[in-house]
Curated annotation (Swiss-Prot):
Name by which UniProt lists this protein: NAD kinase
Cofactor: a divalent metal cation
Organism: Vibrio atlanticus (strain LGP32)
General function of this protein: Involved in the regulation of the intracellular balance of NAD and NADP, and is a key enzyme in the biosynthesis of NADP. Catalyzes specifically the phosphorylation on 2'-hydroxyl of the adenosine moiety of NAD to yield NADP.
Residues noted as binding NAD(+) in the record, renumbered to the chain: D74, G75, N148, E149, H159, R176, D178, T189, A190, Y191, S192, L193, S194, Q249
GO cellular component: cytoplasm
Catalytic residues, chain numbering: D74 (proton acceptor)
Length: 294
């Protein structure tokens, strides 16, 4: 009987010793189980007991592996997702971070849960990403993707900025605020939630627009269909340089008068979970949301 996964990638970056030990234990255990295992080359100097030919770049891992195991917190998963979503590869996480909303597996007993996953006992869901383009004088000046959110904000100095929002080229609203969070369902439990945005079920094909400290009494978050294209036109009268932040990890400079185009990526992240995964249990467990009264 053919295994669901033959080639497995272990992904992470140098962190604390506990995380490094988890990488090492994963490699040894998977190799013993007969899998072909490759490791993120950012760990090559730390894990010097692993043969050098077993290290590859993130792009090469995406091409070669059937399954990627991301060790770390949600930040590691977000960084890996922007690249791995380009390839036909399933992804699961071992939590070595703080919240671990996207990384399901407990590092203390990952073998038990992974054994079932490697037998094919798992559930899979596709999480879409957002593509963000900065247009200046009719040309694309910069571009990146985000699994959680794309955020227009003033940059290093907090002050209000002015911009207009268009949905499928139809004017929606204008705003003076500290910025705007454009979030996927995956990101709805992250920065968007802190900004007062709605929690979107992870399977929804929807995008939320959450104003940041709007200078009005009537502004509210807006949820639109996931296939809609969002265009933000930054006022030419804004002071200084603004930015668009992708997942809080990539910054794209924005000048007054620029257009920001945000739309659903054609790529998806194939995220897998153990069979007993329950989204609402994660909400309660990680966010302390709506515990049962009786």
């Amino acid at each position: 009987m053919k295994k669901p996964f033959e080639v497995i990638a272990i992904i992470g970056k140098p962190r604390d010793q506990q995380a490094i030990q988890t990488h090492r234990e994963l490699y040894q255990w998977l190799s013993t189980e007969g899998y072909q295992v490759f490791v993120d080359d950012r760990l090559a100097t730390i894990l010097d007991d692993i043969p050098q030919e077993h290290f590859s770049s993130l792009i090469e891992l995406g091409k070669r592996a059937d399954l990627a195991i991301v060790v770390g917190g949600d930040g590691n998963m977000l960084g890996a997702a922007r690249i791995l979503s380009r390839f036909d590869i399933s992804v699961i996480g071992v939590n070595r971070g703080n919240l671990g909303f996207l990384t399901d597996l407990n590092p203390e007993n990952f073998q038990s849960a992974l054994t079932d996953v490697l037998k094919g006992e798992f559930m899979e869901e596709e999480r879409f990403l957002l593509e963000t383009e900065i247009h200046r004088h009719g040309q694309i000046k910069s571009h990146n993707a985000a699994l959680n959110e794309a955020v227009l904000h003033p940059g290093q100095v907090a002050h209000m900025i002015e911009f207009e929002v268009y949905i499928d080229d139809s004017f929606a609203f204008s705003q003076r605020s500290d910025g705007l969070i454009v979030s996927t369902p995956t990101g709805s439990t992250a920065y968007s939630l802190s900004g007062g945005g709605p929690i979107l079920s992870s399977s929804l094909n929807a995008i939320s627009l959450v104003p940041m400290f709007p200078h009005t009494l009537s502004s509210r978050p807006l949820v639109v269909d996931g296939k809609r294209r969002i265009k933000l036109i930054v006022s030419p009268d804004n002071r200084g340089t603004q930015e668009v932040s992708c997942d809080g990890q990539i910054s794209l400079p924005v000048s007054p008068g620029d257009e920001i185009h945000i739309y659903q990526s054609p790529n998806v992240l194939k995220l897998i979970h153990p069979k007993d995964y329950n989204y609402y249990h994660v909400l309660r467990n990680k966010l302390g949301w709506s515990s049962k009264l009786f």
